[in-house]
A protein has these predicted regions:
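Domain-scale recognition of functional cores that engage charged ligands
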Residues: 1-197
Length: 197
């Protein structure tokens, strides 16, 4: 693998992504948001380029907050969903949060708590948003943990615990990943307990 700046990627005459020295890029892991890439002239070359993105294009659907009101419309009242609607720009009611469609790690989030108090985070995201019923995180000594889970098919594969000192989990949150494996490895050391990370 080789690291390359986005500005150093070009498109060849036959529509393939290349480095500055015209080496064809066959596989790419990128940190650039898919929604930004797809909105640019550069991104229009993706479908015919033969480039394999290690973050697949379908992930843009799941990372778009617009999926939340659509899920609510189709599965209203489901115990694993919070009520969500596309934002009309009206005042945010108590007990609700506003989230830009394309945002990450708690940026640009106003949270109107059920008790009437507010908490907000700043960030670079603008544009359309959704509103969602807020589910307040439990505080442990002023810290707010959030568990994210990964399920492939019907198998649990991992969890990530993010903890922030704010009710809005931001990019400064502490993070501990955990893998869920089918076979348990031997303990790290005798008497140290059986903790696997």
């Amino acid at each position: 693998g080789q690291a390359i700046a986005l500005e150093e990627i070009g498109i060849s005459a036959d529509g393939r992504f290349t480095t500055l020295d015209d080496t064809v890029i066959g596989t790419l892991f990128k940190l650039y948001p898919l929604e930004d890439l797809m909105a640019e002239e550069f991104g229009k070359a993706l479908p015919a380029s033969g480039l394999q993105l290690l973050e697949p294009a379908w992930k843009a659907v799941l990372s778009n907050k617009g999926i939340l009101p659509l899920l609510w419309q189709r599965h209203q009242g489901h115990p694993n969903l919070l009520e969500a609607h596309f934002d009309t720009g009206a005042a945010l009611p108590a007990g609700w949060v506003r989230k830009p469609l394309f945002s990450r790690e708690g940026a640009n989030i106003p949270l109107h708590l059920a008790d009437g108090s507010w908490q907000e985070s700043e960030g670079p995201y603008t544009g359309p948003s959704i509103i969602q019923a807020a589910h307040p995180l439990t505080s442990f000594d002023g810290n707010y943990p959030l568990v994210g889970s990964w399920v492939v098919g019907d198998h649990a594969c991992g969890i990530g615990i993010r903890e922030d000192d704010s009710r809005i989990t931001k990019d400064s949150a502490r993070f501990v990943p955990h893998a869920i494996i089918d076979e348990v490895p031997p303990p790290i050391a005798a008497g140290s307990g059986k903790i696997y990370v």
